[in-house]
Amino acid sequence: LYIGSTDPLDPRHLQSLKTLIERTEPMLISEHLCWGAVNGKVLNDLLPLPYTEEALQHFCAKTTQVQEYLGRQILIENPSSYLQFAHSTIPEHEFLVAVAERAGCGILLDINNIYVSAINHNFDPSAYLAAIPVNIVQEIHLAGFENNGGCLIDTHSQPVCDEVWKLYHQALQRFGQVPTLIEWD
């Protein structure tokens, strides 16, 4: 869906998604906190948002629009990050929580993405976890990454590392038993 894109939501894609949801009745539906379409062209990548109040309002409005169309709550997943916008004014974890609170969506917390971003941007991944309210995390993802000269890349091509397992155990202590998926591509 690329909710963060400035393009309007594609009504055909939304209808196809709604039909699939009605047919399969999934327990949860998620979308990344990202953008990836410009002028009707899908870039097929999860591109980062500037974490500003303007981007937050935009993302919340489109998340609400998606939920209203689908007739159900969706989850928003934190991305892995390789760059940051200089004009961002809101830390990612605060932005993610604000989306959940304002749009009434849940959070899919990707522990590997937190770790990858923490190493790439030099922040404490445990503090990120501690800043997420307990009642809004509805799913957790784990995965492996590759180290590309000091920049960690979320590839899903490696086993889950010990540090991510440790963060996962912290997450379970904080959020309780949450459905968890190990991603492998």
Question: Can you say where each PLM-predicted feature lies in the sequence?
Answer:
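Glycine/small-residue-rich interface belts in oligomeric ring/scaffold proteins
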Residues: 1-12
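Acidic/histidine-rich catalytic cores of soluble enzymes
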Residues: 67-151
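Conserved active-site loop/cleft motifs that coordinate metal ions or position small ligands
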Residues: 179-185
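Conserved residues at the C-terminal ends of beta-strands
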Residues: 32, 143, 183
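Active-site acidic/histidine proton-transfer and metal-coordination neighborhood
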Residues: 10-106
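Gly/Pro-rich active-site loop or hairpin
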Residues: 8, 46-50, 56, 118-175
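A residue-level signal for conserved active-site and pocket-lining positions in enzyme catalytic cores
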Residues: 29, 110, 180
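Conserved radical SAM core fold
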Residues: 2, 36-43, 144-151
